């Protein structure tokens, strides 16, 4: 993630195999240049680990959620094991909008300025950018993704009717099909740390993006590895440049709901300063999170949540702790990462039996857990739900550890 070195272990692991090379000879290109190593969300992906679940654990009880929970009742209700921080709402689907006409100009995260004589209407986007654009009523003609579109957690709340696919496995892009769709613009999320455009490139190999540039101009929206909120702001800025009126009643209400959720989260954090969080991914060992490397939890820290930080990491993101020693990171509430690469119906109640020794963490033993669906938050509406679910979990938690 944000502060990992390339190739380091991170929560977005590729368990898929790249598709066969595409015949792009008529473009005058060497197809061998376009087969690159698989990539994780924040760098090159390592060999896949299966069954991965990351758990974010919060120490101590917390306060209210969505401004509706009385903090005097904190700890009197059980934490909802079925709460879904990536649940969809009516606000996740915004009707197509009439965009302002005229020329389009935008300087992207790579420092490139894209200038078009008219607003683009035929847009191809990666799954992150597509989800964000659709939250502003802009529907792409095609999407490339790391899983089939219908199973993508990032796209799960979007209306995909009529959208073509130009890639459904990690690091693949169907150049032939994309060219046949005659796009005006190709948009991908850009990670400045790794030079990664749409999970197709690395700092060492930009050939796939270079190839797409021969089909249509490419635009990289900056992924802020220190703040999910800032990444969403970047997408809002792009939507405005694409002619969307951000002050329409629906969009204004969505932003207002988000602001209210953040305000409530800050209230919860300020009222429960005994709360400390720690992130853990149970695999062969416990991977303990450095929260400053995660854009979601960097936001939560900036909003007042206290997080446990390990004494150093092995890769800039995780510190490996043996199961024999995991009790040293004891905690009161567990936020369980839903591994996108191995996504399935996670039953939180079953977690302790899958990882012997994991229940030495008090939160796991006491069944005080909630899911963490990292990577789904590319819009204000999706992030609002996540923030509300977490505030609710904090409000219901009991302190089950001793200082």
Q: Model-found features: residue ranges?
A:
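Bacterial Sec-exported substrate-binding components of ABC uptake systems
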Residues: 2-3, 12, 16-19, 23-56, ...
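A local structural motif
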Residues: 113-119, 157-166, 247-253, 303-315
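A short, structured surface patch at a secondary-structure boundary
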Residues: 122-181, 185-186, 190-201
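Extracytoplasmic ligand-binding site segments that recognize negatively charged/polar headgroups
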Residues: 149-153, 192-207, 220-240, 273-298, ...
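Extracytoplasmic substrate-binding proteins
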Residues: 207-282, 376, 380-403
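Structured C-terminal subdomain patch of bacterial secreted/periplasmic proteins
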Residues: 230, 329-403
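Alpha-helical, coiled-coil/dimerization segments enriched in small aliphatic residues
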Residues: 241, 289-319
């Amino acid at each position: 993630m944000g502060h990992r070195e390339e190739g380091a272990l991170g929560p977005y692991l590729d368990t898929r195999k790249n598709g066969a090379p595409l015949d792009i000879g008529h473009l005058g290109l060497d197809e061998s240049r376009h087969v690159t190593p698989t990539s994780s969300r924040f760098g090159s992906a390592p060999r896949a680990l299966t069954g991965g679940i990351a758990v974010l654990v919060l120490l101590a009880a917390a306060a209210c959620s969505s401004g509706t929970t009385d903090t005097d009742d904190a700890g009197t209700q059980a934490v909802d094991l079925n709460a879904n921080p990536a649940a969809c709402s009516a606000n996740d689907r915004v009707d197509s909008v009439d965009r302002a006409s005229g020329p389009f100009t935008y300087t992207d995260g790579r420092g490139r300025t894209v200038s078009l004589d008219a607003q683009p209407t035929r847009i191809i986007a990666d799954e992150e950018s597509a989800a964000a654009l659709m939250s502003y009523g802009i529907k792409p003609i095609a999407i490339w993704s790391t899983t089939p579109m219908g199973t993508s957690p990032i796209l799960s709340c979007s209306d995909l009717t009529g959208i073509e696919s130009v890639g459904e496995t990690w690091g693949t892009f169907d150049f032939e099909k994309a060219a046949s769709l005659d796009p005006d613009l190709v948009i991908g999320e850009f990670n400045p740390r790794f030079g990664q455009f749409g999970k197709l490139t690395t700092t060492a190999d930009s050939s796939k993006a270079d190839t797409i540039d021969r089909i249509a101009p490419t635009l990289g929206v900056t992924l802020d590895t220190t703040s999910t909120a800032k990444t969403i702001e970047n997408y809002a800025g792009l939507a405005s440049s694409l002619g969307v009126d951000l002050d329409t009643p629906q969009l204004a209400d969505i932003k207002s709901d988000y602001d209210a959720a953040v305000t409530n989260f800050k209230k919860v954090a300020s009222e429960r300063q005994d709360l400390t969080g720690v992130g853990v991914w149970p695999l062969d060992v416990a991977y303990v999170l450095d929260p400053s490397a995660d854009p979601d939890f960097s936001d939560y820290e900036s909003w007042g949540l206290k997080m446990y930080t390990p004494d150093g990491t092995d890769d800039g993101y995780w510190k490996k702790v043996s199961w024999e020693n995991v009790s040293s990171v004891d905690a009161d509430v567990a936020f369980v990462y839903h591994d996108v690469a191995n996504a399935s119906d996670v039953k939180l109640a079953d977690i302790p039996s899958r990882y012997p020794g994991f229940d030495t963490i008090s939160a796991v033993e006491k069944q005080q857990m909630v899911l963490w669906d990292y990577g789904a938050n590319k819009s204000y509406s999706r992030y609002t739900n996540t923030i509300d679910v977490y505030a609710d979990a904090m409000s219901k938690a009991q302190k089950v550890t001793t200082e």
